[in-house]
A protein has these predicted regions:
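Hydrophobic, aromatic-rich transmembrane alpha-helices
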Residues: 3, 92, 256-290, 294-297
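Membrane-interface alpha helices of multi-pass inner-membrane proteins
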Residues: 111-112, 155-172, 178-181, 206-207, ...
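Extracytoplasmic
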Residues: 57, 174, 350-506
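Membrane-interface transmembrane helices that cradle and orient dolichyl/undecaprenyl
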Residues: 99-102, 139-159, 186-191, 269-285, ...
Length: 507
């Protein structure tokens, strides 16, 4: 890195911290954040994913967030600030890598701006989901392996394997990237160093897989169901179906749609695609970054249903490939006129890119239009952090410390003194319950609607919270509230579109 690049490192770090923490504290809540946070709280209570509660992802995230919350508080603000810090670390690593690759601080600055202003980044990384943690590990693995040379230490490949393994521990579908990394090592290592480099890489990856291996050995069936089986049955199309939907998601990625604009993704992708293969330099990391971006996009689209938000994992790699290739082509221009025209074109594209995110910022911070889950809500303020905390405080007023509460959305229980009723640890279990046998439901910690009805009839638990069950729909809400009233539960508080029911035993 040049001296100027090093001087800019701290300001870029601080500006990202301010921006991403602002986004984390003011963005509408995503529905999945509830069960990720509750899973992290359960880990703090010495419970294990798969073995003690339903958890439909690789297991690392709840452990990492639990460790953070152990020291910085069990709260929405604490967890979201942690996500913002992870995103900041990712953006800073991106800046450092581009500066090192191009030896140009201006290219690094452009990369940081493109990263932070991408809708897919500011909308999905600073929230409590797998994206920021998995991407930080994945991008760090890429940075480590991109520095492979005849003089690089062997442990660097071990570190890359370890980091890739940690990303797989967070989002299991990234396992499919292993062949891509192995191919890069094979193609770019000296003949005598290929085998040791690959072994070091695989050794690091194996070490990272130890937690997953432990949980798999403890309950192979529950582990496989949570990471693969759930995705296969959550829709009627199977694990990798609904191809027309995937095509629409790809189309919206480039032309725009309700979740965000398409111009930013089009600029990054087509600039990289148009020029990346014109640079014949061997061991060219930006080309590897582009390959990772494309393969991650394909992998992310495979599970059903396809979700555009998963493609946020491609953005840092597209930024690297686009910025580096433009910089490398720019330095080959000989005349001053050519350089001025190229610089003007870059400034123009940057302006268009930044303008593309203006309306999306308004969506995710103010209106909620087009945001998954929020746009269908009867009261969009139910997905504001202040409203969720208001409901949690109301629960604490009627529940004793440690009392079990059934909430149809996990997020309401997280920042309370209560604990989730058995089977309500994950709010999406009810949606798939009728596709499972009784034995499977017991093994995976899932309740069926009939079992929920039976529990309400027995007045178990005493407190039930109905609201924000976006994955279940209005019909489930109507059924639940009808059952609660029929079995003597009393509505004690309504906050927005959320209701708290309590059963008071008769003397």
């Amino acid at each position: 890195m040049t001296r100027t690049a090093k001087l800019l490192l701290v300001p870029i770090l601080l500006l990202q911290i301010l921006f991403f923490i602002f986004m984390a504290l003011h963005r509408f809540i995503d529905g999945d954040e509830g069960f990720y946070l509750l899973a992290s709280k359960l880990v703090l209570m010495h419970k294990k994913p798969y073995l003690d509660f339903l958890y439909e992802q690789a297991p690392l995230l709840p452990y990492v967030y639990a460790l953070w919350m152990k020291y910085f508080g069990i709260s929405w603000n604490s967890a979201r600030i942690f996500s913002a810090l992870l995103t900041t670390l990712l953006g800073t690593l991106l800046y450092e890598h581009v500066c090192r690759q191009t030896r140009n601080w201006l290219a690094g600055l452009a990369a940081a701006v493109l990263f932070a202003s991408s809708t897919l980044v500011f909308a999905w990384f600073p929230v409590v989901k797998v994206y920021s943690l998995a991407e930080l590990f994945l991008f760090a693995a890429y940075v480590a392996i991109s520095r492979l040379s005849s003089t690089s230490p062997r442990w660097l490949m071990g570190a890359s394997g370890l980091l890739l393994g940690l990303s797989v521990d967070t989002a299991s579908y990234l396992l499919l990237l292993i062949p891509v990394f192995l191919w890069w090592i094979f193609r770019n290592s000296d003949a005598g160093a290929r085998r040791p480099s690959i072994l070091w890489f695989l050794g690091g990856f194996t070490i990272a897989m130890v937690p997953c291996l432990y949980l798999f050995i403890s309950s192979p069936d529950a582990f496989v169901f949570s990471n693969v089986g759930y995705q296969a049955i959550r829709t009627n199309a199977g694990l990798m179906g609904m191809w027309s939907e995937k095509f629409i998601v790809v189309l919206m990625l480039f032309i725009g749609g309700p979740p965000g604009n398409g111009i930013q993704n089009s600029i990054l992708f087509f600039i990289a695609l148009g020029f990346i293969f014109s640079i014949r330099r061997p061991r060219y990391p930006p080309r590897f970054a582009f390959q990772i971006a494309v393969i991650v996009a394909v992998i992310s689209l495979l599970p059903t249903p396809a979700q555009q938000q998963r493609l946020c994992l491609c953005v840092p790699f597209l930024v690297v490939s686009a910025v580096c290739v433009v910089n490398d082509l720019f330095v080959t221009l000989e005349s001053r006129r050519q350089r001025l025209l190229a610089a003007a074109a870059c400034v123009c594209l940057l302006g268009i890119y930044l303008a593309g995110s203006a309306n999306d910022l308004r969506k995710y911070l103010i209106t909620g239009d087009g945001i998954p889950g929020v746009r269908w809500a009867h009261d969009k303020d139910d997905w504001r952090l202040r409203r969720v905390l208001e409901v949690s405080q109301a629960i604490d007023r009627v529940a004793s410390p440690g009392e079990m509460v059934a909430s149809f959305w996990s997020g309401y229980i997280f920042q309370t003194k209560a604990v989730p009723s058995l089977g309500f640890e994950a709010d999406y279990g009810l949606a798939i319950a009728e596709k499972l046998t009784l034995q499977q439901r017991v093994r995976y910690h899932v309740l069926s609607p009939a079992e929920v009805e039976s529990n309400f009839a027995a007045h178990v638990p005493r407190i039930v919270v109905v609201g924000n069950q976006y994955s279940l729909g209005d019909r489930m809400r109507y059924t639940a509230e009808t059952s609660l009233r029929a079995h003597g539960y009393t509505l004690v508080r309504s906050i927005g579109d959320t209701s708290i029911y309590v059963y008071y035993s008769k003397p």
